[in-house]
Amino acid sequence: MKYKDYLKYWQDIASEKGYEESAILLLLLYEAKLTSSELYMKMDDEIDKKISDNFETDVKKYLDDNIPVQYIIGEACFYGYDFNVNNDVLIPRPETEELVENILFLYDDYFKGKDIDVVDIGTGS
């Protein structure tokens, strides 16, 4: 099966079950070891059996066992940085990224030219 058909097939299943289609894309990129651009260039290529087998194992963890994609692939992006994650740590939330961004915008207004200490309390592992 071609990458484009395979991806659409699994994204449709995820969507029907109320899951994010973008998560399916992330899992395919992870197992195929491709960037988004590389995958786009290979959309008409046949998917390798080993990639599809590993991908389907990951998709089942996501759709059937409700395991977050970040735990399956072992990393999460936060404020432009990739962090290793597993069951022992919390996955960074988009709302926390917004908080960091807001604080950085306010920094110059209140603390320009001053050294400050920042304490992160109760926001994760």
What label would you give each PLM region?
Residues 1-73:
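N-terminal auxiliary segments of SAM/dcSAM-dependent transferases
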Residues 56-125:
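SAM-dependent Rossmann-like transferase core, predominantly class I methyltransferases
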